[in-house]
Amino acid sequence: MYKRQEQSRACEGWDKIDVPSVWQLRGYDKMHYTDVLYPFPVNPPYVPDENPTGIYKKTVVLDEQWMEKDTVLKFHGVDSAFDVWVNGNHVGFGKVSRLPSEFDITGFVKTGENDITVRVYKWSDGTYLEDQDMWWLSGIYRDVELINEEKNAVLDLRVNGTLDDSYKNGLFTAGI
């Protein structure tokens, strides 16, 4: 873990950390609880220059059969914000700490070894929206999945319903 983002470029001598887990429970940062005060000077949308940053690296091996389908990288929870690279290519950025984030990495993976790198930032401009009576715990704190799904799969289905004035008849519309 690093105090500043620019310090996090070299990877020699890295420690291992379990995923899912949080830095503070692994001794990489202080436990911090807030109820009404922000844990840093309030100056939206800016965050402190000293913004603890953690880098995660994982190598996965994919076979030719895997490559016949689409590949999605899903994070079930990362706090606070994060960048993702696959084989050196930036594939996305996320900053919704309490919800899953998915990245279609089909065009970035290959048969054989694939390097996945994630840079997690303790603070982001989204931190201003998330501050509440809570412990601040940073890192990849929920599961991560590499999903192999059929090409052109339906990933999102929307159904809307309305009722007529009698509340007896309805009309449903669906979309993907």
Show where each model-derived region lies:
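Intrinsically disordered, low-complexity regulatory regions of eukaryotic regulatory proteins
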Residues: 10-16, 27, 33, 154
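Accessory beta-strand-rich segments of carbohydrate-active enzymes
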Residues: 3, 22, 26, 30, ...
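Hydrophobic alpha-helical membrane-insertion signals
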Residues: 3-23
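Short, low-complexity, polar/charged sequence segments that are solvent-exposed and flexible
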Residues: 10-12, 33-36, 92, 135-139, ...
